[in-house]
Amino acid sequence: MKNSLLLNRYRKQALTWFILPAVIIAGWIYPPAGFLLLLCMIGAVGLSFFSGRSWCDWMCPRGAFFDLLFQNPRQSKPVPSWLHSKKLRAFMLGLIFIVLGTQLYLSWGDLYGMGMAFVRLLTITTLIGIVLAVKVHPRGWCHICPMGTLASWFGKGKLPLYIHEKCTGCGLCSKACPMGLTPHRDKETGEFTDPDCIKCGSCTSACPRTALSFTKTVTAQKAA
């Protein structure tokens, strides 16, 4: 069951990751292709009202790209504190929207110019994300991604991870988390509500006690 959950996630990511390089390449050839980036932006924020940052799991091509190409479960890296900085995230959000907004304003009415604004943004931020993935953490960019930040704000408290009392606090769930989060530290409260949780289920698959679930009643039944 656990392996099937991970395999299912892998298969979904295998279907979406290639969209990232495909859109970048297509965008430089045919700039209007850059408008596809809007779908990812709208999807991430729209879905957050119902299930938090779940879009960032496998539906986001860039998130899938980073997981498949840079994630190594045997060498999990801790997420540095500066990537959790609210000021840095707010700065990135403001910077991206100002830069993108300015380019769209200057090229308004020109589909090629407006499309290229999205292509440039996608290309530059992906390169930054690759550097962070190699040097800092595979999902480093995801911690400062403007859409991810908005999704974490709007999706706060949505679809929490329930922790049954039989949790031993072994920390295997935290080691398996692609975002570098630490669910086991909230065992006393019985809920993990970090807004950066992408609801991927890696933690539930890693738990030897089956004490974690995104469905409260199911958790209690499994861990009983």
Language-model-derived ranges and their functions:
Residues 1-187, 195-198, 202-224:
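Non-ligating segments of multi-cofactor redox enzymes
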